[in-house]
Amino acid sequence: EHIEDDRAELERAAARLAPGGHLIVLSPAYQSVYSPFDKAIGHFRRYDRKGLLALTPPSLRPARSFYLDSLGLMLSAVNRFVARQSSPTPATIKVWDRTIVPLSRIADPLVGHAFGRSIVAVWTRPV
């Protein structure tokens, strides 16, 4: 989430959508795991489903929202509250991309996309 004025940006995006169009947002999830690393890479905040959908522009209707990277969320929580590593090493990123993300792709549907390190929201502009 690299946008300081998130509500205004969603309004601008909604204004560009044609009737029947979709707006898809992928954002970091759960403010409770916001870390110095988030800040270092330009994240202003993290969202849960309720918080992200609260930003719904008046011209759009929520269509779907779900979480991704369930295993990543658990590891981020461990890092945030136990290890307290401020930024990942290149080796950590390599393990994450090659192991954690593929395993999360298997785990996410099993947990119903109910939690994860990222959240996806989809809005539709009515016809």
What are these regions (language model features)?
Residues Y67-V127:
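A C-terminal cap/extension of S-adenosyl-L-methionine-dependent methyltransferases
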Residues H22, F44, S118:
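Gly/Ser/Thr-rich beta-alpha loop segments that engage phosphate groups in nucleotides
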Residues L53-L68, R125:
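A SAM-dependent methyltransferase catalytic signature shared across enzymes that methylate proteins
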Residues Q31-D38, V82-S86:
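Short glycine/proline- and charge-enriched loop/turn segments
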Residues P19-G20, P58-S59, R117:
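Structured helix-beta-strand junction loops
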Residues E1-S35, K50-L53, A121-R125:
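Conserved SAM-binding loop
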Residues P36-A54, Y67-L68:
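Acceptor-substrate binding/catalytic loop of class I
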Residues I3, R46, H113-A114:
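Short, solvent-exposed loop/helix junctions and linker helices
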